[in-house]
Amino acid sequence: MASTLIVDQLQKTGGSTTALPLPTSNASADEFLKNDGAGALSWASAGGGLLGLVVYTSSGTYTVGATTNGTAGNQGSADVSKVIIECQAAGGAGASRGGTGSAYQGGSGGGGAYSKTFRDLTDITSITIVVPTGPAGGSPGAAGGAASLTKASGSGTFATITCDGGSAGGSPSGTTQGASGAGAAVPTTGDINIGGGIGPAGGEGQGARSGFSFMGVGQAFPNGVTTGPAPVGYGSGGICGPTSAPGTGGAGGAGIILIWEYK
């Protein structure tokens, strides 16, 4: 036969006695009984931990506590209170060669900047996410766009996070090779900040690679190709156009933002 134990206090045995009054209300899901050190008991939430990852490969809005976040629209946890943010900007595109029959190459694009940052989301409601696409190669190529996170709503403090994109490779003239694309400057808004790698100037041969980024690898082109290969990873620069026609410069790597959620 089942029995029921009904108490309003717990008292330890042996030595002096300390009353441990139980809370009058029931616990919520996942709560535990906590002692404040003076004998008072209360229900408390379990300790923190990693809840999951929210991925943005395009611009959008991150709503704190929503489960419809991310580019996929199905990511996020209702229990989030803190985040670690990885922000990668786009790389600059490579420039095309100098025209039909030209032996002059464009420069390769520079890599985009990266940062990693811890943030508390207390009283933050939503954050505007900007993720740049990969710029196309051409004459000249286009510069890589910046990636950023800015508070959209809420009374809490959230300083803007910004990483700049890499510069495009320069176009060749009729007598000179294209200039190298500068890597993005080291950011100043993250806890860990890494700038982009420089892209080589035109004419540095098949061993030349476009500018590296923290999340992307610099690209090269094999013998016989006519267009700069696609970027590898995120934020790397585009490779210069090969000397074989049409000699189009490679695209820069797109940006990405990762939000690691914690309780």
Show where each model-derived region lies.
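Acidic, low-complexity glycine/serine/threonine-rich segments
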Residues: G134-G190
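Collagen triple-helix signature
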Residues: G109, G137, G144, G165, ...
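Disulfide-bonded cysteine-rich modules in secreted/extracellular proteins
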Residues: L10, L50-S58
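Extracellular repetitive beta-rich solenoid segments
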Residues: M1-G48
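Acidic glycine-/aspartate-rich tracts in secreted/extracellular proteins
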Residues: K12, N26-S28, D36-A40, A89-G94, ...
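Short beta-strand/loop motifs in extracellular/secreted proteins, especially
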Residues: E31, S81-V83
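Glycine-rich, flexible loop motifs
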Residues: I129, M215, Q219-F221
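Glycine-rich strand-loop-strand elements at beta-sheet edges
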Residues: V55-S77, I84-A152, G238-I259
